[in-house]
């Protein structure tokens, strides 16, 4: 046993050397790993094996080059359509940053609907799936074989039998679809893939990198993107959770092209095959006469460990810094890095009405402690913090100055910004932004406001937990 501990300690030293001199991570993350590998050697060793290893640089660059080249094929055809309305002109620098960092095309011919409850969303999804004529592409983090999951799987299987191309991509950790349901889909002609599978059912050394996206695209006519996964709990059927508050979008128009490109890139990666895109088959022609007439500016922005930049985080950062009047944020998990924390503080100190809404009943106690560790600094700067009490808040949204908003899969935490594969839609439109604001204020009615006075009354155990877990927050 003593020999084993010495071996683990030696390996941990090698890990530390690699983190400092080879991986060259940011100082916060580096110090967090040094602390846990040094003072908790056995636990630290296990955690590092499961959560600490970076995807190799070779894979990073290979995937990034594929991403850039593939998307550039069709992005070139959109350049002549790059026009900005008055709202979008205010955010020209954000639009250009998203384009330069992620090849995120700015489009205007879009219709966008918002969904705040799973019942109406799932009904609409099944309705659109049943109308499919050419293809259905679906990519989800969590997909369960429960009542709603089976309904959607049955709809997919039915369309596959009719000859519609059906591709279903799920995350290896989030997936819990029964094998018999997968077999039925495949037997009907559908295709099913797992993103980052482990080398056996219960062991996955790439657990640190999750495909957190929730995407559904049908015939390039309609797409869905947002925070809802597929399962009965999102319908409020889990007694331990209760009501599930989330936000999702339904998209029609040119913005679908970037979402389709993202799906195809993820699919080819999971399929371990080269990607040969048939533009006519999967993408909307920008000259089509069937495009929506609405002028709703939008960009699909994706990020992940395969990207050299943290695109969604950078987009949030620009929105926060550009806010002049108000800034409303909803996120189930709140673990900002120092630049993001300081941006929120500076916005409030500059007179911007900054409101952040978090779950009052979090699903993980340690995530509550981490979030709480940032409260005092934010409250002192004038940031208003609210805890949602009517069930669980899972929405990932940001809206500023009644003119710009973002909805998607990314939480406001280090994991979503740098480790998970995520996608958000950035919407440059007053009507959509005001709808988001209205829902935010509806949610405020069932929130508890956090004040410095009430916060200082928390228990000693909570204070100790916050202090300890804050040290490893860069790893969360």
From Swiss-Prot:
CDD domains in UniProt: PLDc_CLS_1, PLDc_CLS_2
Q: Spell out the Pfam families in the cross-references.
A: PLDc_2, PLDc_N
**Lineage top rank: taxon:** Bacteria
Q: Which residues form the active site?
A: 212, 214, 219, 394, 396, 401
Q: EC annotation? A: 2.7.8.-
Asked if Repeat is a keyword of the record, the answer is yes
Q: Where are the transmembrane segments?
A: 2-22, 31-51
Question: Which SUPFAM superfamilies does the record match to this protein?
Answer: Phospholipase D/nuclease
Question: Which Gene Ontology terms cover its molecular function?
Answer: cardiolipin synthase activity
Keyword annotations for this protein, in alphabetical order, are: Cell membrane, Lipid biosynthesis, Lipid metabolism, Membrane, Phospholipid biosynthesis, Phospholipid metabolism, Repeat, Transferase, Transmembrane, Transmembrane helix
Outline the extent of the PLD phosphodiesterase domain. 207-234, 389-416
GO biological-process terms attached to the record: cardiolipin biosynthetic process
Q: Where in the cell is it found?
A: Cell membrane
Membrane topology type, per the record? Multi-pass membrane protein
Give the similarity note: Belongs to the phospholipase D family. Cardiolipin synthase subfamily.
Q: What does this protein do?
A: Catalyzes the reversible phosphatidyl group transfer from one phosphatidylglycerol molecule to another to form cardiolipin (CL) (diphosphatidylglycerol) and glycerol.
The protein's name in its UniProt record: Cardiolipin synthase
Q: Which organism is it from?
A: Clostridium perfringens (strain SM101 / Type A)
Q: Which gene does this sequence derive from?
A: cls
